[in-house]
Protein backbone atom coordinates (compact mmCIF):
# COMPACT_ATOMS: atom_id res chain seq x y z
CA UNK A 1 0.00 0.00 0.00
CA UNK A 2 1.20 3.46 -0.84
CA UNK A 3 -1.32 5.20 1.40
CA UNK A 4 -1.74 5.15 5.18
CA UNK A 5 -5.10 4.71 6.91
CA UNK A 6 -5.80 5.96 10.42
CA UNK A 7 -8.60 6.86 12.81
CA UNK A 8 -9.06 9.68 15.30
CA UNK A 9 -11.39 9.18 18.23
CA UNK A 10 -14.29 11.60 18.60
CA UNK A 11 -14.93 10.74 22.24
CA UNK A 12 -12.95 13.71 23.59
CA UNK A 13 -13.73 16.07 20.69
CA UNK A 14 -17.51 16.10 20.51
CA UNK A 15 -19.85 16.81 23.45
CA UNK A 16 -22.80 15.18 21.63
CA UNK A 17 -23.42 11.56 20.73
CA UNK A 18 -21.60 10.68 17.53
CA UNK A 19 -19.65 7.75 16.17
CA UNK A 20 -16.57 6.69 18.13
CA UNK A 21 -14.07 7.52 15.38
CA UNK A 22 -13.53 9.52 12.20
CA UNK A 23 -11.57 7.87 9.37
CA UNK A 24 -8.68 9.26 7.36
CA UNK A 25 -6.31 8.20 4.58
CA UNK A 26 -3.02 9.98 3.88
CA UNK A 27 -1.52 10.08 0.38
CA UNK A 28 1.99 11.07 -0.77
CA UNK A 29 2.74 14.11 -2.97
CA UNK A 30 2.79 11.89 -6.10
CA UNK A 31 -0.91 10.98 -5.71
CA UNK A 32 -3.20 12.53 -8.37
CA UNK A 33 -5.52 14.01 -5.70
CA UNK A 34 -2.72 15.47 -3.59
CA UNK A 35 -3.58 19.04 -2.61
CA UNK A 36 -7.20 18.84 -3.80
CA UNK A 37 -9.91 20.24 -1.54
CA UNK A 38 -13.14 18.54 -0.54
CA UNK A 39 -15.09 20.49 -3.18
CA UNK A 40 -12.92 19.25 -6.07
CA UNK A 41 -14.93 17.09 -8.47
CA UNK A 42 -12.58 14.10 -8.09
CA UNK A 43 -12.80 14.28 -4.30
CA UNK A 44 -16.58 14.61 -4.31
CA UNK A 45 -16.68 11.43 -6.44
CA UNK A 46 -15.14 9.37 -3.61
CA UNK A 47 -17.79 7.11 -2.08
CA UNK A 48 -17.52 7.38 1.70
CA UNK A 49 -19.98 7.89 4.58
CA UNK A 50 -21.21 11.49 4.47
CA UNK A 51 -18.67 12.40 1.78
CA UNK A 52 -15.14 13.63 2.35
CA UNK A 53 -15.32 16.23 5.13
CA UNK A 54 -11.60 16.88 5.65
CA UNK A 55 -8.74 17.55 3.26
CA UNK A 56 -5.40 18.95 4.34
CA UNK A 57 -2.05 18.14 5.84
CA UNK A 58 -1.69 15.87 8.85
CA UNK A 59 -0.26 18.69 10.97
CA UNK A 60 -3.75 20.22 11.28
CA UNK A 61 -5.25 17.11 12.90
CA UNK A 62 -4.95 15.65 16.41
CA UNK A 63 -2.57 12.71 16.70
CA UNK A 64 -4.15 9.54 15.25
CA UNK A 65 -5.83 7.28 17.79
CA UNK A 66 -5.43 4.19 15.64
CA UNK A 67 -2.76 3.84 12.94
CA UNK A 68 -4.28 1.06 10.86
CA UNK A 69 -1.14 0.49 8.83
CA UNK A 70 1.35 0.73 11.73
CA UNK A 71 3.46 3.40 10.03
CA UNK A 72 4.39 6.94 10.82
CA UNK A 73 2.65 9.47 8.60
CA UNK A 74 5.03 11.86 6.81
CA UNK A 75 4.18 15.50 7.62
CA UNK A 76 3.95 16.52 3.95
CA UNK A 77 1.34 13.90 2.99
CA UNK A 78 -2.20 15.04 2.12
CA UNK A 79 -5.13 13.65 4.10
CA UNK A 80 -8.70 12.81 3.09
CA UNK A 81 -11.17 12.09 5.85
CA UNK A 82 -14.78 11.52 6.74
CA UNK A 83 -16.61 12.00 10.01
CA UNK A 84 -19.26 10.12 11.90
CA UNK A 85 -21.01 13.22 13.26
CA UNK A 86 -24.05 13.18 10.98
CA UNK A 87 -27.67 12.84 12.04
CA UNK A 88 -28.22 9.25 13.16
CA UNK A 89 -24.53 8.51 13.74
CA UNK A 90 -23.83 7.06 17.16
CA UNK A 91 -21.20 4.94 18.95
CA UNK A 92 -23.12 1.71 18.39
CA UNK A 93 -23.45 2.24 14.65
CA UNK A 94 -20.00 3.77 14.08
CA UNK A 95 -17.76 1.77 16.37
CA UNK A 96 -14.09 0.92 15.76
CA UNK A 97 -14.86 -2.04 13.48
CA UNK A 98 -17.35 -0.21 11.24
CA UNK A 99 -15.22 2.93 10.98
CA UNK A 100 -12.17 0.80 10.13
CA UNK A 101 -14.13 -0.91 7.32
CA UNK A 102 -15.27 2.42 5.88
CA UNK A 103 -11.75 3.85 6.14
CA UNK A 104 -10.35 0.82 4.29
CA UNK A 105 -12.94 1.36 1.53
CA UNK A 106 -11.78 4.97 1.16
CA UNK A 107 -8.18 3.76 1.14
CA UNK A 108 -8.99 1.25 -1.60
CA UNK A 109 -10.50 3.98 -3.80
CA UNK A 110 -7.47 6.22 -3.31
CA UNK A 111 -5.10 3.32 -4.07
CA UNK A 112 -7.03 2.58 -7.29
CA UNK A 113 -6.75 6.21 -8.39
CA UNK A 114 -3.01 6.03 -7.71
CA UNK A 115 -2.67 2.89 -9.87
CA UNK A 116 -4.69 4.44 -12.72
CA UNK A 117 -2.43 7.50 -12.79
CA UNK A 118 0.73 5.49 -13.45
Predicted segments with their positions:
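Acidic interaction surfaces
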Residues: 1-118
Amino acid sequence: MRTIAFLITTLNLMPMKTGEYNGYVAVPPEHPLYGKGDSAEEVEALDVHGGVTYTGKIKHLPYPSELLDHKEIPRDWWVFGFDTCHYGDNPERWNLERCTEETRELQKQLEELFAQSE
